[in-house]
Every structure is written in C-alpha cells, then in structure tokens.
Amino acid sequence: METWKTNLDETKKRYIDWWNHKGIILNMWEHFQEDVKPHADIPAPSPAKDLNQKWFDPQWRAEYLDWYVAHSSLKADILPVANTQLGPGSLAAILGGVFEGGEDTIWIHPDPDFNDEIVFNPEHPNWILHKELLKACKAKANGHYYVGMPDLMEGLDVLAALKGTDKVLLDTVMQPEVLEQQMQQINDIYFKVFDELYDIIREGDEMAFCYFSSWAPGKMSKLQSDISTMISEDDYRRFVQPFIREQCQKIDYTLYHLDGVGAMHHLPALLEIEELNAIQWTPGVGEPQGGSPKWYDLYKKILAGGKSIMACWVTLDELKPLLDNIGADGVHLEMDFHNEREVEQAMRIVEEYSSSSSDVSKDCLLYTSPSPRDSTSSR
C-alpha cells in the first residue's frame, strides 16, 4: 500500500498489541475534515441526484469516499478506511430484505415473501450490489486506504430484520429447534459471504472493518446480538453463544458489540467464549457515553476476563480519569474528536501511559494469536 496515513506502521503495531490485550489505541468512529490539509488533490463528485444514487450507485460512492478519505484527518490511530456499509445488518438484504435509503442511513425492511427458508441466491441484486460497491471502491482506493468490510451482522439480528423482531422472539418458544437450524444456516451463509467480500477488500492478509473503523492483520469481524436485550440468559446460551463462538473460531480477530444495559446480563456468556478477542460497549439511549465513570467496573470486568475493550465517544476530559481507573493495556479509545487540536491533546495524554503499557513485538504477535486457532481457521 502507498497509504495516505504516514504513521500506519505504528498504528498497525498498536492494533496488534491491542488484539493481544496490550497497549492503547487512540482512534475515532468515522472521521472529521475541519481544518485538515488534504492528502491528495481529489475533487468532490457532483452532489448525488437522489438517495438512491447516494447509497446504491457504486461508482458515485467510490468517488465520494475517495474524496472523503483524502480530506479526513488521519492523526493518531485514525485509520484510512472507506465506509462501504449498506445499512446495519446488510446480510439480511442479501437474503431478501428490502433496502431503503435514508438521509443518514440505510434501512433494511423485512422480506414480504419470507417463509422461514434461509436461502442464499448468488444472483440476488443486493448481493451483486455488495460486490460491485467494494470492487469500485477498491479500484478507486489504489492502495491509498483500506476498503472497509460492510456491517453484515449475523444470527438473531439478521433473522429479525428478515421477518420481524416479535416473530423471532416467539420462535424461541414456539419453534426453538427450527430457530437453532436457522441460526446455523445464517452462520454458514455468513462465512461464504464474508470470505468472498474479504477477498475483494484484503490488502495482503490485512483488512479493515467499517464499523468502528478497525484494523487487523488478518480476517476480523464485529459480532453482535442486539435483540439479546429481550431474551433470557438461557436463550442466549442456546440461540446466540454457540454461533458467536463458531464465528470467533473461524475468524482470526473478533470484536463483540455489546449494546445497552439490557444486554449486560449476557457478559458472563461472552467471557466464556475463549476465542473472542475484544468487547465494545455501547451504553444505549439515556445513558452516559463510554468514557463515563459509570462504566469503569464493566471495563475492569471485561479486561479481567481476558478480553480487550473498546470505549466509544470518550471526551477529552474523560480520557485521563478513564485510563487512571482501568489501566493502559487492551484499551481501544473511540474518541469524540472534532479537530486536530483535540487529537494532539489526546495524544499527549496517552503518551503519559505508554511506559506503563507492556510492549509486544510485532514479529512474535503475528505468529502467536491471542486466541489460538485450530485448523478450521479461515485465514
């Protein structure tokens, strides 16, 4: 790669440390452009003529993302990655869900013809769109930045997008055996889809993920089950945990998105998944964001369980107290940055903790996975 990020090697080293529960990453979700010197003279495309072009025209999006990354700050560990997301849980659209472009996001509506059959159609237009979008972005990137993996999602969340949340919750009682079978079918399709998209976006073995703008030296994914706020611990261990575990066993680097205080009771089941590398915490509506002292004990519990953490929307005034309380190893900070002055302030704060964070050599880590993979690894 001839990347626009001049310190990419240092950032990759910090990511490898973090996957191995060491050190600090200073990043942010998405990017900002305020007072940023462009990395290249990339003109902005003409404004999208409508929402359909804004989201579903691969060439327009590739041109827009090329301009976007070229004009975004890449200081600290902010990654050069094009966000190719096609809505949260776009695997559901690949399986028949209906796309609707909004002003700020893409909605995926249930398939009106869904009949409980989980079928992958390689000719489905939504699947073709995924591939065409990533190929267009990869060609436009020209090695200057990563093309991110879309937010596919998995499991119950995908099924809920296909048929509706209420129906999935009823299935846990009315047809649990069928539901288990569907979870395995979705996982099997997930791996097929993931592998094909990975082969489009990969840089060597490396890749980046759109959600949380993250990087890994091999295959990585963000996993979740937002519907789990509405199910019991027993149901989680039956309908979620086994399939998350399979993903963690087959994908080298995995981050679980734990969303909302209503999902916290599933943390013990997550910590039981030995192969899971890290957990991201989203407090949810009405709660303080990830840098709040309210979550210190949660982060400590995750770290003590052998997982790295990702804290999101941390503000500058929260940064030092957070690190003082939870330590400086295995901590990924998704900061609430608005300009490069704030990034530089945060870098100075984090530098104070670098000596207390154990160094791990890149060469060693590339060959010693934090969660040993057996021969079933998809690397």
Model-identified regions with their sequence ranges:
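A contiguous, low-structure linker/loop signature
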Residues: 83-114
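A diffuse structural propensity rather than consistent per-protein peaks
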Residues: 114-115, 315
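Conserved small/polar residues in nucleotide/adenosyl-binding loops
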Residues: 367-372
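Active-site loop segments of alpha/beta catalytic cores
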Residues: 1-51, 63, 68, 75-83, ...
